[in-house]
Amino acid sequence: MKYCKKSFFLVALLFTSLPSFPADFGIVKGSDNQVIELVRMNNLLPEYTRQAVRYGIEGSVKVQFNVDTFGAVLDPFVVESNPPGLFERASIKAVRKLIYQPPVFEDQAVNVESVQVDIVFKLQ
């Protein structure tokens, strides 16, 4: 019986602690700072760390990366993290799995630079 209670608690916790992604924009490489919107083909969410769940910690991470002409994420890195040291690894891992619709500008497939996503970790 104890096992069932723990399983239910874990499932309930997973549904109440999902991070969220806002819309994504980036700069067309080689353009005069032309900004375009990127369309996600998937929306993989990072895992909320056990330590953060255990202690009720919420936070956010800003990740920057480039997107190639096929829609793949390149070179993600953390720009800002609050609190530092807790959510960065999960955020980078999730961002690497994102796939975008191949970006097009003026009927040409383009590379997009300086895409930033803010990932918010919030317990509900």
Task: Outline where the language-model segments fall.
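Boundary of Sec targeting at the N-terminus
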Residues: 23-24
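N-terminal signal peptide c-region/cleavage motif recognized by signal peptidases
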Residues: 16-20
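Short proline/glycine- and basic residue-enriched helix-capping loop/turn segments at helix->loop/beta transitions
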Residues: 29-64, 91-124
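Bacterial N-terminal signal peptides that target proteins for export
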Residues: 1-9
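A short acidic/small-residue loop/turn micro-motif
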Residues: 80-86
